[in-house]
Each structure stands twice: as C-alpha cells, then as structure tokens.
C-alpha cells in the first residue's frame, strides 16, 4: 500500500503550504476541471522517487469547542490512519503550549513522528531549533515550506523505511490480483458492499477492520464469462454485536489507496440523497490519480418517474466536469443494471491502456487543424506540427509546435474532444502536453 503522511500541528504553522508543496507535482499533471471543487485536505504526493498520500489534518490548539472540536477529532483520527506523522511547529514563534499538548498525544500514538520546524528561512537555524528539543522527538527537521527549502531532504528521510515496503506491496498486488483491478468507492452506506457482493455473485461480508492488519483493502480475484478481474473491496464492514445490519466504517484513506491500486474505479452514489460535495470530491480524487472512472447511481429501483428525471438532470448538471464518464443507474440489491457495468469496465480499461502510433496521432492533429485552425498570436498563427503518445493510464498525448504556450484553453479543449471522439476514448482523462520547438535564430537571452 502507498504510505500515508499526516501533517499535524497547531493553526498557522504552515501545514497547508507544505501540503501544496508535496502535492503540486501531481496537481500539475491534471487540468482544473470547471465545476470541480477539490477537497484540499487529502492529496496524492510525489517527490523524487517517493509516492505517498498526504493528509492535512487542520489545526489543533487544545481548546476547541463545537464544530472545531469535531474537526480536531477528525485530525486525531487521521493520525491513526497515517504511516508517518509530520509534526509541524513554527520556528519564528518558538515553543507554544499547544505544541506541547499535541506532542503529548503523539507520544502516546506509537506512530513514526518527525518533528518539522518550519519558517526557518532568514533566521538563525540553531536558535530556532533550540526550543523544540525539549519535546523529545530526537532529530529536528528545519524547513521553509513556502520556498521548498529542506522539503526534499525531509521526505527522503521519512520515506526511506517504506521504499522496500512499497516495492513489496506492488509485487504482492500483482501476485494477488488478476485481470482488470476494479476499485469500488463512495460515501458510507451508498451500497458499496452490496455492489461488491453482487459483482462477485455471492453474499459475503469480509471482516478486515481488525486491529493490527497491515492492509485495509481486500483483493478478491474472480472470473466472469471466462475473463479475470480483481475487486478491491474497501467498505470496511463490521458487524455490530446483537444487531443484524452491517455498519460501514468510512475511511477516506482506504478509498484513496484503492484508487491508486485500481485500473478502473466505480464511484457509487446514492440516488436517494442526490449528489453531494463528497461525491464530487471522490470523483476528483479518481481524476487526480488519472484512473478510469465509472459512475454508478445506486438504489434506482423503486424511485418514482419524477424523482428519476430530477436525478438525471442533476447528474447532467453537476457532472459536467467529467462528460466522458459513463453513468449507470443500478440497483445493487436486486442486480438491476449491474451486469451492464462490465462492458464499460472493459472499454474504460482499453482506453486507459491504449497504444497509438505517432503517424495516427499526427494525422488526427492535421485533420483537426484543417477543420479549425489555431488562433493568431501577434499576427502569427500558432503552428502545431506533430503529436505522439507520451504514456498511458491515463493516456498522455504530446503535441509539438511553435508558440504552444499561447494556445488558449478553448482550443486545447477542442483538440481533446476531437482526439477523444476519433480514438473512441471513454472513462479516462486525457493529458495533453504542448511543447514548443526552439527557434535557432531567436536572440539568446
């Protein structure tokens, strides 16, 4: 499993700044989709060779009340789910009683804690660090998150113990999983477990939330119509004592890890509750990870015609940022529409891993330009010369030309739509990279 880093500290010590530093390289790969609001508390990070999930836990001061108290509790829960805790303090303001309160909690957590002294730029580092040795976390890590100073060194140190584990986990996943890996994610009680059971064709409630387990997701290989699949089950089912119904323990970290491990992700949405922000955030996580996405609107049976029409119009309105995702209206409980998911799983997987020749991509580019030329910039037309594939899962298409930095977003969207239509790409984002050729006659700067 990909390691999880939790950023912990009192308010205004620079957690959000460090979060942005750690997730920036991944965000840069994915366009900002109009209409999509991202939940900035969780993100995929990559620095050098290290990949990880980052949680910004929000500030904890020790005197929270009301909603702040709930947020602080969420922060403490996030610590429980993390592999590494980066405890941030402010090097300019020195030690604070809230720092000592947080330190006391972290010492009891039995987690790997690294004490990170932020905002050390422009001040005497030794003096800035001196106060914090008393917290008893051993080596201190001075950084300046706003400039990125010391961040690479910090991540190299804290991720070192996990390098071997990550490699082992990847190997284990490849051993345990066969065929297309399907992640099933969604909010609590939307019917994920029912859908998993229906897809497997058997009624099973897997208890895997036991203390001490190293992996929270269960990989279930199975065969359907002579094709192999692996379901990644994250629902976190527990049976209440003396109560028949299963109670779902929701974990955003499990969902993010499942998304990372999957080839195709089914986002399950409860039709009785309409689309809520958390549903959109979940779809956003899938897009940011570059995975194939399918939307399953569950509990469709029994809805009145008017309710169905209302939900369909809401889906059309609110999922405009992901027009290429197929939407299925299903009943996991009764099996309605579940079988139809497989055709979409197959076509989405094929789109994610498709390979195209440079010749074919360049021909599509030329046809697109013939139909609608790029605009003029400073009395010169932007020239797009050729295209080639730069990667898959998600598909990446690299377009070479002149003045590509000046290409407007509207024309990039036009190209994406043309390529998507001609190549029949469904269920996955396409990443376009535009590269400008150097002009050998341009004056040297």
Swiss-Prot record:
GTP 1 binds at residues 9-16, 56-60, 118-121. InterPro entries: AAA+_ATPase, G_ENGA, GTP-bd, GTPase_Der, KH_dom-like, KH_dom-like_a/b, P-loop_NTPase, Small_GTP-bd. SMART domains: AAA. It comes from the Bacteria. Keywords: GTP-binding, Nucleotide-binding, Repeat, Ribosome biogenesis. Coiled coil: none annotated. Associates with the 50S ribosomal subunit. This is GTPase Der. It comes from Marinomonas sp. (strain MWYL1).
């Amino acid at each position: 499993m990909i390691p999880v880093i939790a950023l912990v500290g009192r308010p205004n010590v620079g957690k959000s700044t460090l979060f942005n530093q750690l997730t920036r390289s991944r965000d840069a790969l994915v366009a900002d989709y109009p209409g999509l609001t991202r939940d900035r508390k969780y993100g995929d990070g990559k620095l050098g060779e290290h990949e990880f999930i980052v949680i910004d836990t929000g500030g904890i001061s020790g005197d929270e009340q009301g909603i702040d108290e709930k947020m602080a509790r969420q922060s403490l829960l996030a610590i429980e789910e993390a592999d590494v805790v980066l405890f941030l303090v402010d090097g300019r303001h020195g030690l604070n009683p809230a720092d000592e309160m947080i330190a006391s909690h972290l010492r009891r957590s039995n987690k790997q804690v690294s004490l990170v002294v932020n905002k050390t730029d422009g001040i005497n580092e030794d003096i800035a660090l001196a106060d914090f040795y008393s917290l008893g976390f051993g080596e201190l890590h001075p950084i300046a998150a706003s400039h990125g100073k010391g961040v690479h060194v910090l991540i190299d140190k804290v991720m070192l113990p996990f390098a071997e584990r990550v490699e082992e986990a990847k190997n284990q996943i490849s051993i345990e999983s066969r065929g297309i890996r399907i992640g099933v994610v969604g909010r609590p009680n939307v019917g994920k477990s029912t859908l998993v059971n229906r897809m497997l064709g058997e009624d099973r409630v897997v208890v895997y939330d036991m203390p001490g387990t190293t992996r929270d997701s269960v990989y279930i290989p199975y065969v359907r119509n002579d094709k192999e699949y692996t379901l990644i089950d994250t629902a976190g089912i527990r049976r209440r004592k003396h109560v028949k119904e299963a109670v779902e323990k929701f974990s955003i970290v499990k969902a993010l890890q499942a998304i990372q491990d999957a080839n195709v992700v089914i986002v399950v949405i409860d039709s009785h509750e309409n689309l809520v922000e958390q549903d959109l955030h979940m779809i956003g996580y899938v897009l940011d990870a570059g995975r194939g996405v399918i939307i399953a609107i569950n509990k469709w049976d029994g809805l009145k015609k008017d309710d169905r029409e209302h939900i369909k119009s809401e889906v059309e309105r609110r999922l405009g940022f992901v027009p290429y995702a197929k939407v299925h209206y299903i009943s996991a409980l009764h099996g309605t529409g579940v079988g139809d998911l497989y055709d979409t799983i197959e076509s989405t997987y094929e789109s994610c891993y498709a390979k195209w020749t440079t010749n074919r991509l360049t021909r599509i580019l030329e046809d697109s330009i013939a139909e609608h030329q790029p605009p003029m910039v400073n009395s010169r037309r932007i020239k797009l010369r050729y295209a080639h594939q730069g990667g898959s899962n998600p598909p990446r298409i690299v377009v070479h030309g002149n003045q590509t930095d000046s290409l407007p977003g509207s024309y990039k969207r036009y190209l994406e739509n043309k390529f998507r239509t001609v190549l029949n790409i469904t269920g996955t984002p396409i990443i376009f990279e535009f590269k400008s050729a150097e002009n050998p006659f341009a004056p040297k700067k």
